[in-house]
Regions:
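Conserved phosphate-binding/catalytic region of the ribokinase-like
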Residues: 1-5, 14-18, 33, 161-165, ...
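Beta-strand->loop->alpha-helix junctions that form or flank phosphate-binding loops
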Residues: 64-67, 86-95, 223-225, 232-234
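Hydrophobic beta-strand scaffold residues
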Residues: 59, 85, 170-171, 201, ...
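Glycine-rich phosphate/adenosyl-contacting loop at the front of the ribokinase-like
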Residues: 1-64, 69-83, 257-259
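A short, aliphatic-rich alpha-helical micro-motif
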Residues: 131-135, 193-194, 225
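Conserved phosphate-binding/catalytic loop of the ribokinase/pfkB sugar-kinase fold
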Residues: 101-153
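Short beta-strand scaffold segments in enzyme catalytic cores
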Residues: 98-102, 239-242
């Protein structure tokens, strides 16, 4: 099988267990073990690349990070998962993008990017992408996060267009918030990406409604799916819904104890892509994606996606 090309963000996540620290401070107790700030490999598309690789499919990652200790950590992290990093470039002029992830008492996160704009991940250029890339890949996965700034935005949109014209499936994780629409160029790029995608994935709370310009998640998904695009709405403990044309499929979530939600959507994306490339139906692919996400949230770290053996074992004893 030809590899999946994952083009997009890669960063170092600094996970800050604020709720644990605040509780300890309020009670006058010592911080529990394992409650320190942790630096881990992150980036939504990089996480998805690792999720696909752990499920046994070949993966090629294209992106940019700083030529520093964090950048080396990120490259080594991808290679440890057997992700091909030949299209990962070090930018000597920028430090590696950092994301501060502050966790509350439920494991939900609030993210702060550092820097907020013009980070290393937006430095990817068209010349990083080989001229024959269309002949070398089976699927392209991208994110809305890269559409904020050039050269990343134009590089991604051009590759999406080329893949669409040549029959290579394109999946697009929206992965932006409402403030994106305050930037006319960013908003325009999102609309372009919407028309170039075969599969659109996003959260029910904000991402799918934002992309469709419709506040109700179901109406938003239906409008995006009218032209035959597959639209997948992730909704946490409720599960996920798939829309395509007039078809709707619901896949319930698996019940697990939530430890950390970081990377759950990225894991879902990777498992869905892997399942479809392995020939599973949309319904079965959604079930596998929900199972993979459930395993992810029961662990700690954005790279908590399961291996093929772990996913199969979990599915053998479902707890939906």
């Amino acid at each position: 099988m030809k590899p999946v090309l994952c083009l997009g963000d890669i960063c170092a996540d600094l996970i800050i267990p604020y709720a644990i620290a605040a509780k300890a401070k309020a009670s006058g107790t010592m911080l529990p073990g394992g409650s320190d700030v942790r630096a881990v490999e992150g980036g939504s598309v990089a996480n998805t690349a690792c999720a696909i690789a752990r499920l046994g499919l070949p993966v090629l990652f294209a992106g940019t990070c700083g030529n520093d200790a964090y950048g080396l950590m990120l490259k080594n992290g991808l290679e440890r998962e057997r992700v091909d990093t030949s299209l990962l470039r070090f930018d000597d002029g920028k430090p590696t993008q950092l994301v501060l992830l502050v966790l509350d008492e439920t494991g939900e996160r609030t993210a702060f990017a550092c820097p907020a704009h013009f980070g290393s991940q937006h430095s990817i250029t068209a010349d990083q992408i080989p001229a024959d890339i269309i002949d070398r890949i089976s699927w392209l996965h991208v994110t809305g996060m890269m559409l904020r700034e050039d050269p990343a935005a134009s590089t991604q949109l051009d590759l999406m267009r080329r893949c669409r014209e040549n029959g290579i499936p394109v999946s697009f994780d929206v992965n932006v918030r409402v403030e994106a629409m305050n930037d006319p160029t960013f908003a325009e790029n999102l609309m372009k990406a919407k028309t170039l995608s075969d599969v659109i994935l996003g959260s029910a709370i904000d991402e799918i409604p934002l992309l469709a310009g419709e506040r109700d998640p179901e109406l938003a998904a239906k409008s995006l799916a009218e032209n035959g695009t597959t639209v997948i709405v992730r909704n946490g403990a409720y599960g996920a819904d798939l829309y395509c044309g007039t078809e709707r499929l619901h896949a319930p979530a698996f019940r697990v104890e939530v430890t950390d939600t970081v990377g759950a959507g990225d894991t879902f994306d990777g498992a869905y892509i892997a399942a479809r490339l392995n020939g599973l139906t949309p319904s079965d692919a959604m079930r596998e994606a929900n199972a993979a996400a459930a395993i992810c949230v029961s662990r700690s770290s954005g790279r908590a996606s399961p291996t093929r053996a772990e996913l199969d074992a979990f599915l053998a004893e479902p707890s939906e």
